[in-house]
Each structure stands twice: as structure tokens, then as C-alpha cells.
């Protein structure tokens, strides 16, 4: 018998978008990752401007190129193959392998994995719009998918690509420069960056106020899973909950 995970109503969800002080201008900055998890969209929804950090070096076997879904209740990794000549270049210059080598197979995997879901067409539309045509720029395709999901979830936060900005510098200096160029008063950071921000002395560099994202993904029912599998791609959340409940799940404010 499949274990039934608690529904959203069964336990509280941390919804920082509802209690962050928003009298100032909040900037969030992230690399354009591949089919990102729900927390990525919570970060976007909690900011006034979101920046795709596409000027960093592409790393092999990173979240820029891979993520996880459920297949028959079991965690399954999906990844996009890279043109080897672009590994190590800035992300905005990275290219995937020719689309015919991976797009059709990956789409079929998604379609079969979530064939049970009445929300699959909405999700595949987002995937198709980003990855089915156009150039092979990894950053462009990832950003296009993220923008399509934001549109589906009615998240209206404007997006900016760091590669179109003047800001530069290493690590924290670059983040501060981006915030300053956008007149940001608060930098909203994922908690996973806390160690390197502390190492860089972010709060002593004369930049914006630093605030950390507070998002804990609540369990939701997952078909055939024997227990809740957390931090999967937003695709899994959408296919199980649908757009309206996914919007509530990530704490997007009206």
C-alpha cells in the first residue's frame, strides 16, 4: 500500500512572502538552473527583481544541467548533455548538444512519468516553449523555462540577466554590484549561500541589507511513492498539485 503523505492543509507551510518586510527593494540572484525546484520559485516570488546570474562559469554535473523527478514513485535524474567545448566557459556561452540527441527522449520521459496528471499538458507546454526550438544556449533555455513557469503561476516579478548589466567582481562583490545597479536595498539569499557570504564578509562590504530565504517544502501526495521525496523539480509539484495549489505551496502573494 502506498503511503499517503499529508496534504498541504495538514501541516503549516513556511510562507516568507507573507512576512518579509517589503517596504524596501528586494533583489534575489540565482543561476538559471535546469527545471528548478519549488524553492527557486518561492525566491522569485519573494523578490521585487530577480536576476539570472548567467555570468558565472559553467560547472559539469551541476544543477545548471540536471534535476530530479519521480518515475513510478522512485527518484529519477534527468540531465541535458553539454557541448564539451563550452564546459568551463561563462554560463551565457554554454551550449547543449544538438537538440535531436536529447529533447525528444527527455520529453517522453516526462510525459510517461506524469501521464496520470491532468496538469501534465500545462507543464509540458512550459517545457516545450523553452527547449523545443531556438538556439542551443543552456542559460537562455533554462531562463525561458523558469519564465514560463512564473507565467503559469502568475508570478509577475521582473527578470534581468546579469550578462546585460555592468556589474562585475568576484562572488559577493558581484552580488552587491548587481543590487546597487538595480537600486536594491535588501539582498534575499538562499540559506545555502550563508557560509560563503560569511566568508566574504558580505555584511562588511557596504552593500544592501542581507536577508535569508526561509522556505521549507511541505510534503504533498506523490503517486506511487512510499514516502515523500523532497526537493524535486517544480515539474513534480505542478503535476501533483496543479498551478493553483502550486502557487499556494510556494507562498506566492496575490
Language-model segments: which ranges?
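Compositionally biased, intrinsically disordered low-complexity segments enriched
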Residues: 14-15
